[in-house]
Design a protein with these regions (language model features):
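Short conserved segments within the C-terminal catalytic ATPase subdomain
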Residues: 53-64
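Short beta-strand/loop element within the Bergerat-fold HATPase_c
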Residues: 98-110
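Glycine-rich/acidic phosphate-handling loop/turn and adjacent ATP-lid/helix
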Residues: 114-132
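Conserved glycine-rich
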Residues: 146-147
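Conserved micro-motifs of the catalytic ATP-binding
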Residues: 27-32, 70-75
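Short helix-loop "hinge" at the ATP-lid/N-box region of the Bergerat-fold HATPase_c
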Residues: 90-92
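Short alpha-helical segment of the dimerization/phosphotransfer core of two-component systems
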Residues: 7-12
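Detector for a conserved hydrophobic position within an alpha-helical segment of the HATPase_c
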Residues: 141-142
Length: 166
């Protein structure tokens, strides 16, 4: 019984966190962004923390295509932490541990992206999600003058976080 109660508490906490993120992301006031900095400086620690948590949860990582270039972006550290926390939690819930989580970087002239791809463990689990976390990520990225592109099929989930050049 204690396991059931604990799982329900974790579920309620997750939903509460998502509602809080949503209220932050929907705030109409101009978001204060951090000073422009190199993409690795802005994102590297969040990716390292995500990698640590995923490895602790028995996931393997493929980071061969994660390359850092001299590319300045402007972010809000609070939002970025929430975004990567959400992505990490979703991977832990829905990803297949038998396939590596792939993290790569993409550079274009006016923007750069971090793409995270994983195989889906159980297709039916995607129907039990509210989708609020992805909506929150999309709203937060928009407030940072970026965007989140999400795609998935029956076997794979992909999210790309696009950051505008500062």
């Amino acid at each position: 019984h204690i396991d059931v109660i604990f799982n329900k508490i974790c579920e309620i906490k997750g939903l509460t966190d998502q509602l809080f993120d949503y209220s932050l992301a929907c705030n109409e006031e101009a978001l204060e962004l951090d000073a422009p900095c190199n993409m690795e400086s802005a994102i590297g620690d969040y990716l390292s923390e995500m990698a640590f948590i995923l490895r602790e949860n028995s996931f393997s990582l493929d980071i061969e295509k994660l390359i850092w270039k001299d590319f300045k972006i402007t972010v809000n550290s609070n939002f970025l932490g929430r975004i990567f926390n959400n992505i990490t939690n979703n991977i832990c819930k829905y990803a297949d541990k038998k396939a590596p989580v792939c993290i790569s970087s993409i550079y274009r002239s006016k923007d750069a992206g971090i793409e995270i791809t994983n195989h889906i463990a159980d297709k039916s689990s995607l129907f039990n999600t509210t989708g609020m976390g992805i909506r929150n990520i999309t709203l937060m990225m928009k407030q940072m003058n970026g965007r989140a592109i999400v795609s998935h099929n029956n076997t794979e989930f992909r999210i790309t976080l696009w950051f505008s050049r500062a």
